From Swiss-Prot:
Name this polypeptide is given: Cytochrome b
Highest classification ranks of the organism: Eukaryota, Fungi, Dikarya, Ascomycota, Saccharomycotina
GO molecular function: metal ion binding; ubiquinol-cytochrome-c reductase activity
Cofactor(s) this protein requires: heme b
Additional facts recorded: Heme 1 (or BL or b562) is low-potential and absorbs at about 562 nm, and heme 2 (or BH or b566) is high-potential and absorbs at about 566 nm.
Residues holding a ubiquinone: H202
Length: 386
């Protein structure tokens, strides 16, 4: 017997990375998981090196970032890799979630995989927010102030909870230090969740674009899918390198190169681009508590998809109506991202409310109604063919 099968730890790696049977019909959209793993490794590695030279004291935070940029050997490169790596992490994550919704990867028996994936998404957003704050530029300070103030909308405990989060009466030294500590911890929690995600996926294996059982037509992960993954890894690294070396600040905000000043409010307070759709949902509700509930509900509503999707056929590959509404949903989500960076004024307020309503209607109304309709059409077609 080969050593990769007889040795305890190697046999575990073998069952996941070498002999793992995968559907032969997997397309390149299924490579996003490996790209997300690569992004996580890049973020952890670059983050550890940045933490070696960063000071979390509020009076030194901004200066220490500039010290990394100017004085540390290749410090500018490490920082740009980390900053752009966060953006590319979310590009791959949003694409991965979109792929899962399109191909019905959340349906039984992979509900646990989907639930863990949503938890990973939430922790990743929290990690990104915490990391954006401890740069302590102007946008970092006011972003931390605005987002943490949202907790004051919680009835009864909100007013006391915000100073507890700050560790003071405003965003100050304890806030930045605890945000840095949590930001350093979160990627390792993510790594543990990713392992759980893979373990849950390994039970039933990957789904496939056709939405049918592929048990009779599978291929070993190595070397078919390893080399297939390498194709997208090289493409990813090429595009990533173009941003890091030639346009490192495109995905950032210029106000964050100004030291944080609690006495000067920026013209517009916006988070990083990958949080904009949910920020737009938050702003579209006039009531503060309602906006906070809507923002968190917009993320947690992903968990209802295994329940609301009643289709007997997995995925949208052969379903024209579902496919049409999915692309309308995709356009609506991009629209929310655009609205999140615009000023709160007419007509963007009404457009944001309309897009928010469409976002929730997709999960609550469109998916169950359309899937039920397509089930009826499916059974009519099967009876007619028989």
């Amino acid at each position: 017997m080969a050593i990769r099968k007889s040795q305890v730890y190697l046999s575990l790696a073998n069952s996941y990375l070498i002999d793992s049977p995968q559907p032969s019909t997997l397309n390149y959209w299924y490579n996003l998981g490996s790209l997300l793993g690569l992004c996580l490794v890049i973020q952890i590695a670059s983050g550890i090196f940045l933490a070696m030279h960063y000071s979390s004291h509020i009076d030194l935070a901004f200066a220490s970032v500039e010290h990394i940029m100017r004085d540390v050997n290749y410090g500018y490169l490490i920082r740009y890799i980390h900053a752009n790596g966060a953006s590319f992490f979310f590009v791959c994550m949003y694409a991965h979630i979109g792929k899962a919704i399109y191909y019905g990867s959340y349906k039984s028996p992979r509900v646990l995989v989907w639930v863990i994936g949503v938890v990973i998404f939430i922790i990743t957003m929290a990690t990104a927010f915490l990391g954006y704050c401890w740069v302590y530029g102007q946008m970092s300070h006011w972003g931390a102030t605005v987002i943490t103030n949202l907790f004051s909308a919680i009835p009864f405990i909100g007013k006391d909870l915000v100073p507890f989060i700050w560790g003071s009466f405003s965003v100050s030294n304890p806030t930045i230090q605890r945000f840095f500590a949590l930001h350093y911890l979160c990627p390792f929690i993510l790594a543990a969740l990713v392992i759980m995600h893979l373990m849950a996926l390994h039970v039933h294996g990957s789904s496939n674009p056709l939405g049918i059982s592929s048990n009779i037509d599978r291929l070993p992960f190595h070397g078919y899918f390893v080399f297939k993954d390498l194709v997208t890894v090289f493409v990813f690294l090429l595009i990533f390198s173009l941003f890091v070396f030639f346009s490192p600040n495109t995905l950032g905000h210029p106000d964050n190169y100004i030291p944080g000043n609690p006495l000067v409010t920026p013209a517009s307070i916006v988070p990083e681009w990958y949080l904009l759709p949910f920020y737009a949902i938050l702003r579209s509700i006039p009531d503060k508590l309602g906006g906070v509930i809507a923002m968190f509900a917009a993320i947690l509503i992903l968990l209802v998809l295994p329940v609301t999707d009643r289709s007997v056929v997995r995925g949208n590959t052969f379903k024209i109506i579902s496919k049409t509404f999915f692309f309308l949903f995709l356009y609506n989500f991009i629209l929310l991202g655009q609205l999140g960076q615009l000023h709160v004024e007419v007509p963007f307020i009404q457009l944001g409310q309309f897009a928010t309503l469409n976002y929730f209607l997709y999960f609550i109304f469109i998916v169950p109604v359309v899937s039920t309709l397509e089930n009826i059409l499916f059974y009519i077609g099967r009876v007619h063919n028989n």
